């Protein structure tokens, strides 16, 4: 790793930093590497459903986090090791050599176990914001390496735009997409991503697609290209995914699952009212973003 650049004086705080969700317009599994990682092709699309992060400088070098949605929001102890925002902060702290720390406050709006990349987006926004807060800047290739070490989806959220994604998620090509609106439905139940990828009946040999083939849909149903190879397995593991897709069909909408679920989505073309979502399921109308809110950071 190359030497980090001290770019400016540290800031006292940064507030209202967005971390947008993504939808996978399609997700094809094209193979599997000898180390077990799956090879994929997908288009990742940014949407205006965001978590919000706040950062306050700590001069004692400690990294702490609280969830503003939690009843125990004043308890800064027992930070979960799997928390991606904390892991991102610690990784950047180690890579940059800064003696500074941070307290992170998170307003969690993107549902977990949804396939919308909420935790990965939090981590990416954390990396970008903390470079400013701490007054350091890593070379872009080093920042991307940290992002990939945190999770396959994190590098996408550093890229700044919608993207054609290949490999294990590290091969990212920016693309443009037409402005559009979507309805996203998240059922109460989640699904385990490892369980999906370990399923013996997961299709792992979808024919490789091309960006040219995807672009050919530009004047047609671009958001209907391809399919999600994870969806049939996820539907078996989580029946509420099938129920969610049935609900979309009842609204005359053609839906599919995003990522490894359990959220599903469909393009909408007007502001017509939709029926209430079943039970305590989350339903939200969204627009796609043309660029990431932190694209110039």
UniProtKB/Swiss-Prot annotation:
Pathway in which this enzyme or protein is active: Isoprenoid biosynthesis; isopentenyl diphosphate biosynthesis via DXP pathway; isopentenyl diphosphate from 1-deoxy-D-xylulose 5-phosphate: step 3/6
GO-annotated molecular function: 4-(cytidine 5'-diphospho)-2-C-methyl-D-erythritol kinase activity; ATP binding
Catalytic activity: 4-CDP-2-C-methyl-D-erythritol + ATP = 4-CDP-2-C-methyl-D-erythritol 2-phosphate + ADP + H(+)
EC supergroup of this enzyme: transferase
Binding of ATP, residues: 111-121
Annotated Gene3D superfamilies: 3.30.230.10, GHMP kinase, C-terminal domain (3.30.70.890)
Protein name: 4-diphosphocytidyl-2-C-methyl-D-erythritol kinase
Organism this protein belongs to: Polaromonas naphthalenivorans (strain CJ2)
Upper taxonomic lineage: Bacteria, Pseudomonadati, Pseudomonadota, Betaproteobacteria, Burkholderiales
